Amino acid sequence: MFHRIEEALEDLKQGKVVIVCDDENRENEGDFIALAEYITPETINFMITHGRGLVCVPITEEYAERLQLEPMVSHNTDSHHTAFTVSIDHVSTTTGISAHERATTIQELLNPASKGSDFNRPGHIFPLIAKEGGVLRRAGHTEAAVDLAKLCGAEPAGVICEIINEDGTMARVPDLLECAKQFDIKMITIEDLIAYRRHHETLVTREVEITLPTDFGTFHAIGYSNSLDMKEHIALVKGDISTGEPVLVRVHSECLTGDVFGSCRCDCGPQLHAALAQIEREGKGVLLYMRQEGRGIGLLNKLRAYKLQEEGLDTVEANEKLGFPADLRDYGIGAQILKDLGLQSLRLLTNNPRKIAGLQGYDLEVTERVPLQMPTKEENKTYLQTKASKLGHLLNL
């Protein structure tokens, strides 16, 4: 149904337009997107004729600062916080509204010699400031346009226009597919663009390394930062893991209540300790401690989920009641850390098949699943049964 990101990039490099859809739980819209560097009056005319929406120009903060483009409003109450600047027309234009003059304004916006005084305010082109980090920080069309431009090696600016049906309603995916077919346009999703960037870009940085003596043995501890969500993670490495043989690995998601306070609601603390002990016994391996509290929903939301469980919901139902998926974790950052450690082939300590699939999706080979089942307690029996029945965990209960 959708095209690959690589296909869209090739068309954009040729000055063509693509359609980009966002999530159905967000705006659930599609936009025409083109590279600002290659914009022509013909492309503008196509957008306003067949898109019928507002023509905007996503740019970086640097463009806005250089051209002194102030925010359109001092207090942004838009539900998605779209960062409109004041609208502009280039001083060489007349009314500024024609396709030709809108293209001129966009071309001059990209001109490195242009100054803020070269543009009249307000005008008919609406610059939008993309967030630093692009779609990895905000999954909007603004960020998608700038990301696509960067991936094409072009100036970091795009031209976008919402697609509206002839009857005035917003075009949804079935309508957008018809539009793409009619005009032979590639169609991609922001979700796929996020996945593409996560797969192709290095988002982790090795920050510090120390020797860490523990009750289970002495480990080489390596601290990592990441540019995706700014969370900090730590890898505990034992022995020589550079032999090329499959390495015993545990990817452990942070659980403050279980790991630190010894909560009996889950089996996280015992799993953490058992994994460290097993790696120590083998003489080599990695425990990767990921800051993904509560399967990614955070500490306070996990406590809220616990409250709902006290009222009768199970762990999956509680997450969903709070508006979260059953499991919000993404293994891309963890996979990048494991690759930074030089690993390609793993023996994974886990009961969770989704974790195996998540890591394999980033080109890591899992040669063996090593079970890590802890004794069941009365307090976590229902929790473990739900993980087995609803999340697919491989447990003998």
Swiss-Prot record:
Pathway in which the depicted protein is active: Cofactor biosynthesis; riboflavin biosynthesis; 2-hydroxy-3-oxobutyl phosphate from D-ribulose 5-phosphate: step 1/1; Cofactor biosynthesis; riboflavin biosynthesis; 5-amino-6-(D-ribitylamino)uracil from GTP: step 1/4
Record's catalysed reaction(s): D-ribulose 5-phosphate = (2S)-2-hydroxy-3-oxobutyl phosphate + formate + H(+); GTP + 4 H2O = 2,5-diamino-6-hydroxy-4-(5-phosphoribosylamino)-pyrimidine + formate + 2 phosphate + 3 H(+)
Residues that coordinate or bind D-ribulose 5-phosphate: R26, E27, D31, R138, A139, G140, H141, T142, E162
Cofactor(s) in the UniProt record: Mg(2+); Mn(2+); Zn(2+)
Domain of life, per lineage: Bacteria
Chain positions recorded as Zn(2+) binding sites: C255, C266, C268
Keyword terms: GTP-binding, Hydrolase, Lyase, Magnesium, Manganese, Metal-binding, Multifunctional enzyme, Nucleotide-binding, Riboflavin biosynthesis, Zinc
Gene3D superfamilies: DHBP synthase, GTP cyclohydrolase II
Binding-site list for Mg(2+) 2: E27, H141
Role played: Catalyzes the conversion of D-ribulose 5-phosphate to formate and 3,4-dihydroxy-2-butanone 4-phosphate. Catalyzes the conversion of GTP to 2,5-diamino-6-ribosylamino-4(3H)-pyrimidinone 5'-phosphate (DARP), formate and pyrophosphate.
Name used for this protein in its record: Riboflavin biosynthesis protein RibBA
